[in-house]
Swiss-Prot record:
GO molecular function, a single term: NADH dehydrogenase (ubiquinone) activity
GO biological process: mitochondrial electron transport, NADH to ubiquinone
Designated name of the protein: NADH-ubiquinone oxidoreductase chain 3
Cell location: Mitochondrion inner membrane
Species of origin: Microtus pennsylvanicus (Meadow vole)
Gene: MT-ND3
Catalysis performed (reactions): a ubiquinone + NADH + 5 H(+)(in) = a ubiquinol + NAD(+) + 4 H(+)(out)
Oligomer status and interactors: Core subunit of respiratory chain NADH dehydrogenase (Complex I) which is composed of 45 different subunits. Interacts with TMEM186. Interacts with TMEM242.
Family: Belongs to the complex I subunit 3 family.
Membrane-crossing residue ranges in chain numbering: 4-24, 55-75, 86-106
Keyword Ubl conjugation listed: no
Pfam families, alphabetized: Oxidored_q4
Membrane topology per record: Multi-pass membrane protein
C-alpha cells in the first residue's frame, strides 16, 4: 500500500512539473539570451552546429555499460542469500543481453570512428 502511494505521488509530481514546464511561457526571450557566450568575442563560426552522432553513440554505449556496472555491483552482497540460482540467472541474462547489444553495435560498425 505504501509503495503504491509513493508511486502515485511520484507520478502526480512528475505530471505537475511537466505540465508547468509546458504551459508556462518563456520569460524574456531576446536575441542576446539565445546567442552562445563566446567570452566577449564575436563567434568565429556558428555555435549551433549539428551534434555528431558518433559522440552520441559513444555516450549511449558508455551509459549502458555504466548501468551494467551499477546493476551488478551489489551482487557480492546479495550472494549471502540462500537462493543464488535466481540471482545468478538474472545476472547472466543481463550480461548476455548487453553482450549481444555490443556485438550488434560492433557488426553495424557503430564503434568505428572513421567514416
Amino acid at each position: 500500500m505504501n509503495m503504491m502511494l509513493i508511486l502515485l505521488m511520484n507520478i502526480a509530481l512528475a505530471a505537475i512539473l511537466i505540465s508547468l514546464a509546458f504551459w508556462l511561457p518563456h520569460l524574456n526571450v531576446y536575441t542576446e539570451k539565445a546567442n552562445p557566450y563566446e567570452c566577449g568575442f564575436d563567434p568565429m563560426s556558428s555555435a549551433r552546429l549539428p551534434f555528431s552522432m558518433k559522440f552520441f553513440l559513444v555516450a549511449i554505449t558508455f551509459l549502458l555499460f555504466d548501468l551494467e556496472i551499477a546493476l551488478l555491483l551489489p551482487l557480492p552482497w546479495a550472494m549471502q542469500f540462500p537462493n543464488m540460482n535466481m540471482l545468478m540467472t538474472m545476472a547472466f541474462i543481463l550480461i548476455t543481453i548487453l553482450a549481444l547489444g555490443l556485438a550488434y553495435e560492433w557488426t553495424q560498425k557503430g564503434l568505428e570512428w572513421t567514416e
